[in-house]
Regions:
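Pre-Walker A-like glycine/lysine-rich segment at the N-terminus of P-loop NTPase domains
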Residues: 1-64
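Short acidic, glycine-rich loop/turn motifs
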Residues: 7, 92-98, 120-124
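Generic "edge-of-domain/loop-turn" microfeature
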Residues: 12, 26, 97-99, 112, ...
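Short, mixed charged/polar active-site loops
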Residues: 14-16, 98-102, 130-131
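Electropositive, glycine-dotted interaction segments
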Residues: 109-220
Length: 220
């Protein structure tokens, strides 16, 4: 379940944009639209409205790019045309296996390399206090490397940056890295993006005719 999306220097976005699904529990009007899990309160559904060319479609494209990166698919990320910066920044916070996690990465469009990765677990107690536990961090630019698995830090600087780190090595030998990989892949496989423009007009007409009670089947 998506909790937050973070975008910077991607497509139309030339500065950081944060889309949050965290529910404001002070507002009781839409309490039925709140999913509660392990002290986290997340909106079940949200809508994005705005005029043309404000980034709505590109926002969804960024979610697709995050999914593609997590599933080791070729990246088509593009940096903003009006900034002298080829580095795209994306991040996502999500619920998976009744826990909240955060993953951020930076992709250099020119070099086609992932120059930054950071995975953390967000732990929240019954009083609303949060703490972040970092599992993995790889910062190529600043040469900062960390992994909760012992003896893995020394490997990080010498591994290729062509894909996310957990696709570069056999993770089964490392407890935290292997669990991180399973969490991210499991979550990414649950992201579904429906493009309404790709629905054939013929299918729409058949549905309107309600042949063989198609409308009832869709409602079911």
């Amino acid at each position: 379940m998506i909790v937050e999306i973070r975008i910077n220097n991607c497509y139309i976005f030339n500065q950081e944009v944060v889309f949050s699904m965290n529910a404001d529990m002070r507002n009781k009007r839409f309490i039925t639209n709140v999913h509660k899990e392990n002290n986290f309160n997340i909106l079940k559904a949200a809508g994005i409205y705005g005029s043309n060319n404000t980034g709505k479609t590109r926002f969804v494209k960024c979610i697709a790019d995050i999914k593609n990166a997590l599933l080791n698919r070729k990246s088509r990320l593009m940096s903003n045309l009006f900034t002298d910066n080829s580095i795209c920044e994306l991040g996502i916070t999500f619920l998976e296996f009744n826990r909240e996690f955060s993953f951020d990465f930076k992709f250099d469009e020119n070099k086609e390399e992932y120059i930054y990765e950071c995975f953390s677990e967000i732990i929240k107690d019954q009083y609303g206090n949060e703490r972040t536990q970092c599992w993995f961090k790889k910062d190529v630019i600043n040469k900062e490397y960390y992994c909760a698995d012992e003896n893995l830090d020394t490997m990080l600087p010498v591994i290729s940056n062509n894909s996310l780190f957990f696709y570069q090595i056999d993770t089964t030998k490392f407890k935290y890295l292997d669990e991180m990989k399973k969490i991210l892949i499991s979550f990414a496989n649950k992201i579904d993006i429906v493009n309404m423009n790709n629905i054939p007009i013929k299918h729409t007409i058949e549905l309107m005719k309600n042949k063989n009670n198609l409308q009832n089947k869709i409602v079911e």
